[in-house]
Design a protein with these regions (language model features):
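Conserved glycine(s) of the Walker
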Residues: 20
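Hydrophobic anchor at the beta1->P-loop junction of P-loop NTPases
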Residues: 13
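Conserved substrate/cofactor phosphate-moiety recognition/catalytic segment
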Residues: 23-78
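Phosphate-binding P-loop
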Residues: 2-8
């Protein structure tokens, strides 16, 4: 019988804009030994407003910084969970890059896909735009529609969290799911 060990898990926070990825990630970080690496915060720290492009190249660059930071944290054993936030992970290549990274470091991974109705997501986005509460200035209803149209389905194992069902129930679901992955036998 193989003993179950609790090992670090890199978590992809996937979902359309406004579906609650950051809210769920922050709530999980309060409950678990976790670090949240937010692409939008990283971009804002690296680039002055006039240098922010919201381009695929800049997003991919920031994702690589997230992964380098994750490798550093994993090497220091400073977090059991690394939550990758601030990117929709709407494209397969984005998710595959994270899975490749995890394979290279022999680290477990999980995908949490946040979902909600279009009306709720758009209302959240409109509120954030009006109040200027999000670091990504391109995070608008138009971006939601653009990403939804080009979304590539997630074929990997995942937990779908309906963020309309209340934060506590979604976080509880995610906590149980992540604990199972962290304790799987090798």
């Amino acid at each position: 019988m193989t003993e179950a060990l609790e090992l670090p898990v890199v978590v992809i926070m996937a979902g359309l804009p406004g579906t609650g990825k950051s809210t769920v990630a922050r709530a999980l970080a309060r409950r678990l030994p976790a670090a949240v690496l937010d692409k939008d915060t990283i971009r804002a720290a690296l680039f002055t407003p006039e240098r922010v492009e919201y381009s695929r190249a800049q997003d991919d660059f920031c994702q690589e910084i997230m992964l380098q930071t994750a490798a550093y944290l994993l090497g220091r054993n400073s977090s059991s969970y690394i939550l990758l936030d601030g990117r929709t992970f709407s494209r397969r290549y984005q998710r595959e890059r994270v899975l490749q990274f995890c394979a290279q470091l022999h680290t477990r991974w999980a995908i949490l896909e946040c979902v909600c109705s279009e009306a709720i997501a758009l209302a959240r986005l409109e509120k954030a735009v009006a109040e200027q509460t999000h670091p990504a200035m391109n995070r608008t209803p138009d971006l939601y529609h653009q990403i939804r149209k080009s979304w590539e389905p997630i074929d990997n194992p995942k937990l779908v969290i309906d963020t309309e069902g209340g934060l506590d129930s979604g976080v509880e679901q995610a906590t149980r799911y992540l604990a199972q992955i962290a304790q799987q036998s090798r």
